[in-house]
Amino acid sequence: GSSAASDVYKRQLTAKEIVNTYSESALADLLFAYGELRNAKKIASLIVQHRPDEIATTMQLNEVLRQVLPKGNEHKVLAKIYQSLRMEVNKEIDVLQSFLTQSKDVLKSGGRLSVISYHSLEDRMVKRYIQNGNFDSEPAKDDFGNPTLYFKKCGGLVVPDKEEIKQNNSARSATLR
């Protein structure tokens, strides 16, 4: 039988749909928020200008973006653009928020929460949540205005050393809190 959950997975947003249907401002917001790209508006504008012709492949998208890519640093900007698309398709920020919010309800008192994040946006969210019990920069407060801390920090930030990165290159951006 078909369940509501499996229907959600059948009809998943694709990067192709994002590139070809999101408004210029929605694309710019996405690229700025998830890719932390300062020239997000310029990139979004360029994508929208090429819309009469559908952008169906990564090669086509790379070609469209070529004129805004800094010489010698193309791969870094492209990585941030594709990261933004992946994060939107997979709803990664929503999933992380949901996970963190549920964690305080399922952890035993005195239990430990360890989270590995792979880029600064995720790490900032995790750090704020552990520090403040919410995703704002201000701590959650009880009825008397006292900070309500759900987590006690134990141990510091852990990042991979050179040897680990040599063995597993994808670990280079990982941060354990």
PLM regions and their residue ranges:
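Cysteine-centric redox/oxidoreductase cores and disulfide-bonded domains
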Residues: 19, 24-90
